[in-house]
Amino acid sequence: MSNINLVQLVRDSLFTIGCPPSIITDLDSHSAITISLDSMPAINIALVNEQVMLWANFDAPSDVKLQSSAYNILNLMLMNFSYSINELVELHRSDEYLQLRVVIKDDYVHDGIVFAEILHEFYQRMEILNEVL
């Protein structure tokens, strides 16, 4: 897995999605790569323990909102995400945010076209969570 060129993978996937080269700034594989979005939290991409991880931080909802949204959140969490090592997205909570996270299977991190599909599917999950919250 250490042979992954994360910068090139992300760059290729962004070109595949249709991002103009002029808006893709210098990418650095020594820290998380952040894809800023207009109306959603940023998508972060990094190598963690030699595995590609994607995550997005949402503002932490109140306990009441979280409880009232539990059914919809559970449905989101149980949706198949076939690119993930456990075929699911994960949700982690802190005082400051809810983090939607996925660790990608090694088979899918060598092709920009496939990684573009992963980014798109992850973004769709972000949209669902954003609507629920």
UniProtKB/Swiss-Prot annotation:
The keyword Chaperone applies. It holds the Pfam family Invas_SpaK. Gene3D superfamilies: 3.30.1460.10. It comes from the Bacteria. Keywords: Chaperone, Plasmid, Virulence. The keyword Chaperone applies. CDD domains: T3SC_IB_Spa15-like. Coiled coil: none annotated. InterPro entries: Invas_SpaK. Homodimer. Belongs to the SpaK family. Required for surface presentation of invasion plasmid antigens. Chaperone specialized in the storage of effectors within the bacterial cytoplasm, maintaining them in a secretion-competent state, and allowing their immediate delivery to target cells upon contact of the bacterium with the host cells. This is Surface presentation of antigens protein SpaK.
